[in-house]
């Protein structure tokens, strides 16, 4: 996979990063190098290797699934600037 100049500009726009035309070739090379490294990783034989979620073995602490105080939705949303039907209202952030 190779990244072209138009893709670099699109990524910069999506990330809201100002990129000049002079910077595009350098970033294109950097992104292509990263993708080449990821392609190398796909060649590694991982058959029989257990997936890891941490470098040290860990177990999640579990709690009893019991009913606690409920019906406090009004208390939860009372400090929110905008709510509707006990849901938080937030400004639209996706174009």
Swiss-Prot record:
GO BP of this protein: glutaminyl-tRNAGln biosynthesis via transamidation; regulation of translational fidelity; translation
Pfam family, one: GatC
Matches recorded under SUPFAM superfamilies: Glu-tRNAGln amidotransferase C subunit
Keyword match Nucleotidyltransferase: no
EC number: 6.3.5.-
Catalytic activity of the protein: L-glutamyl-tRNA(Gln) + L-glutamine + ATP + H2O = L-glutaminyl-tRNA(Gln) + L-glutamate + ADP + phosphate + H(+); L-aspartyl-tRNA(Asn) + L-glutamine + ATP + H2O = L-asparaginyl-tRNA(Asn) + L-glutamate + ADP + phosphate + 2 H(+)
Domain of life of the source: Bacteria
Family: Belongs to the GatC family.
PANTHER family reported for this sequence: GLUTAMYL-TRNA(GLN) AMIDOTRANSFERASE SUBUNIT C, MITOCHONDRIAL
Function: Allows the formation of correctly charged Asn-tRNA(Asn) or Gln-tRNA(Gln) through the transamidation of misacylated Asp-tRNA(Asn) or Glu-tRNA(Gln) in organisms which lack either or both of asparaginyl-tRNA or glutaminyl-tRNA synthetases. The reaction takes place in the presence of glutamine and ATP through an activated phospho-Asp-tRNA(Asn) or phospho-Glu-tRNA(Gln).
Assembly information from the UniProt record: Heterotrimer of A, B and C subunits.
Protein name from the UniProt record: Aspartyl/glutamyl-tRNA(Asn/Gln) amidotransferase subunit C
Organism per entry: Bradyrhizobium sp. (strain ORS 278)
């Amino acid at each position: 996979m190779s990244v072209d100049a138009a893709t670099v500009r699109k990524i910069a726009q999506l990330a809201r990063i100002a990129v000049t035309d002079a910077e595009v070739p350098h970033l294109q090379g950097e992104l292509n190098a990263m993708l080449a490294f990821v392609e190398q990783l796909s060649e590694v034989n991982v058959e029989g290797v257990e997936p890891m979620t941490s470098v040290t073995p860990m177990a999640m602490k579990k709690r009893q699934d019991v009913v606690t105080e409920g019906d406090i939705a009004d208390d939860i949303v009372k400090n929110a600037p905008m709510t509707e039907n006990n849901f938080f209202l937030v400004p639209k952030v996706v174009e």
